[in-house]
Amino acid sequence: MHILLSNDDGIHAPGIQQLAEALRTLAFVQIVAPDRDRSGVSNSLTLDAPLRMQTHPNGDIAILSGTPTDCVYLGVNALMRPGPDIVVSGINAGPNLGDDVIYSGTVAAAMEGRHLGYPALAVSLNGTRHFATAAAVTCRLLRALTSTPLRTGKILNVNVPDLPLSSLKGYKVTRCGSRHPASEVIRQTDPRGREMLWIGPPAGSFDAGADTDFDAVNRGYVSLTPLQVDLTASAALPVLSDWLGDTEGLGSW
């Protein structure tokens, strides 16, 4: 098995390095990751400038100023030969639960892998201590996927409680919960007297029901949430069609 491994915390982050070490006991692993922290950049691609790479002595490749999506795109289409069998993103230092998946570069890297036709996992730890737990969980999932392929055509978003491996209660299949809308803005003044604005932390959970990713992780379970590239709100299509049929004033051609 050949694994393309990326993240959004940067190539030197402990999460990706510990995950690479664990995965290399199972398969060939090629890291292609940003050279710095690119958290929160979602699915952005760099289209207004060339991208340069730096190959480390161990073969890991850093994309200078690249986004997670850049890294997976370049890894699949130019840098990894033979190509990957699966794309893995993580381990993120912090969860990607509920609305987090909209902004997450970790999820975006997996999304790009799936968009390019590969199975893909995004792995996040609900904290910053037990990366070894998340790495072990990822290895177990990959062994299971190898023996029994998951033919959903979806991205698997994995959130792991920040606990010792022996303290995990198991796995739960979940849906994305949701957070309250974030509103905090932190105002500061730089040394030259100019105002600076920092976007504050995410808000707390709003929908954390029994079948959500929030609830599973809070109760000590690994959360497994299938995600998809297609953002069409299928249930809203007939509502929109009825609205269009009943609406006047849009004009005709």
From Swiss-Prot:
Family annotation (SUPFAM superfamilies): SurE-like (SSF64167)
Molecular function GO terms recorded: 3'-nucleotidase activity; 5'-nucleotidase activity; exopolyphosphatase activity; metal ion binding; nucleotide binding
Disulphide bridges: none
EC number: 3.1.3.5, 3.1.3.6, 3.6.1.11
UniProt keyword NAD, yes or no: no
Cofactor(s) the protein requires to work: a divalent metal cation
Major localisation: cytoplasm
Localization terms from the record: Cytoplasm
UniProt keyword Transport present: no
GO cellular component, one term: cytoplasm
Its biological purpose: Nucleotidase with a broad substrate specificity as it can dephosphorylate various ribo- and deoxyribonucleoside 5'-monophosphates and ribonucleoside 3'-monophosphates with highest affinity to 3'-AMP. Also hydrolyzes polyphosphate (exopolyphosphatase activity) with the preference for short-chain-length substrates (P20-25). Might be involved in the regulation of dNTP and NTP pools, and in the turnover of 3'-mononucleotides produced by numerous intracellular RNases (T1, T2, and F) during the degradation of various RNAs.
Family statement: Belongs to the SurE nucleotidase family.
Protein name, as recorded: 5'/3'-nucleotidase SurE
Organism: Sodalis glossinidius (strain morsitans)
Gene field: surE
